[in-house]
């Protein structure tokens, strides 16, 4: 008893270490189905390194979003060990935004005895709807920087969407979350047809404007040629005294021989 009283600080330290190890042991046994992490990523090399580390664990997919600094991991894996390894390999601070732990009830089934004295297995989660994160890729032929925000609004309003990545170069969008992909596909197709109609209308308006400009230019040139012909006719066939006087000042040269004598 005297020893316990003389060294309370050492005992406290030992107790704290024991609690820390116990907590880590508990976390090591926790399996999650999906998690969203916040990690600072400046370049694609950082994202590749994170995906490479995640592949060492039992993960189904690892999606990195450099713009939002988010990493979405799905599968049956140990989140505590994954985060610990990522911190060690990257040296970056990692924040767990969301996580879904795998319930132990999903593996335990109840045994019920029926009227024939036979055992029947009844799953615990038979009435529970399955909620899983999925990754769906949508091809959008008319996707460009001009329409990126419009399609982004459609995706963001869809229920169950966690995040999405726009690939302008390959004309596609990768959407991640627990959502109705058929409904989202219909909405994206509707928005795409709207953009096609708008682009067609803009093209027709542009063609009409160009035709109008060409007509105006042709009319302007016709007026110029008409004025030139009128002046030439006056110089060749003067009628009034004024035209006869003005005709004296005109000099006409032959186009065939510019060095020929002039007619005045």
From Swiss-Prot:
Keywords noted in UniProt: Coiled coil, Lipoprotein, Metal-binding, Methylation, Prenylation, Repeat
InterPro entries cross-referenced by the UniProt entry: HIPP4/7/8/17/18/19, HMA_dom
Pfam families assigned to the protein according to its UniProt record, in alphabetical order: HMA (PF00403)
Residue ranges of every copy of the HMA domain listed in the record: 32-95, 133-204
Residue spans crossing the bilayer: none
Keyword Flavoprotein: no
Disulfide-linked positions: none
Propeptide segment residues: 262-264
Record-listed Cysteine methyl ester modification sites: 261
Lipidated sites in chain (S-farnesyl cysteine): 261
GO MF, any single term: metal ion binding
Top-level division of the source organism's lineage: Eukaryota
Coiled coil segments of this chain: 185-218
Family indicated by similarity: Belongs to the HIPP family.
PANTHER family to which the protein is assigned, alphabetical: HEAVY METAL-ASSOCIATED ISOPRENYLATED PLANT PROTEIN 17-RELATED (PTHR46195:SF30), HEAVY METAL-ASSOCIATED ISOPRENYLATED PLANT PROTEIN 7 (PTHR46195)
Function noted in UniProt: Probable heavy-metal-binding protein.
Descriptive protein name: Heavy metal-associated isoprenylated plant protein 17
């Amino acid at each position: 008893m005297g020893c316990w009283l003389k060294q309370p600080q050492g005992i406290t330290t030992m107790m704290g270490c024991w609690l820390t190890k116990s907590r880590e042991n508990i976390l090591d046994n926790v399996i999650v189905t999906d998690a969203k992490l916040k990690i600072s990523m400046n370049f694609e090399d950082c994202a590749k390194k994170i995906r490479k580390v995640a592949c060492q664990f039992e993960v189904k997919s690892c999606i990195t979003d450099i713009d939002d600094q988010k990493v979405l991991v799905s599968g049956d894996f140990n989140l505590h060990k994954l985060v610990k390894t990522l911190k060690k390999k990257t040296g970056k601070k990692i924040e767990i935004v969301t996580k879904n732990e795998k319930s132990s009830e999903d593996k335990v089934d109840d045994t019920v005895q029926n009227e024939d004295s036979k055992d029947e297995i009844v799953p615990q989660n038979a009435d529970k709807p399955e909620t899983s994160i999925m990754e769906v890729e949508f091809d959008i032929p008319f996707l460009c920087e001009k329409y990126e925000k419009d399609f982004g609004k459609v995706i963001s309003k869809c229920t169950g969407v966690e995040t999405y990545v726009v690939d302008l170069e390959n004309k596609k969008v990768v959407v991640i979350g627990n959502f109705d992909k058929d409904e989202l596909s219909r909405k994206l197709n509707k928005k795409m047809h709207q953009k096609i109609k708008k682009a067609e209308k803009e093209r027709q308006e542009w063609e009409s404007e160009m035709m109008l400009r060409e007509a105006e230019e042709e009319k302007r040139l016709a007026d110029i040629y008409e004025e030139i012909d009128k002046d030439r006719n006056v110089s060749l066939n003067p009628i009034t005294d004024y035209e006869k006087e003005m005709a004296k000042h005109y000099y006409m040269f032959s186009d065939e021989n510019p060095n020929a004598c002039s007619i005045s």
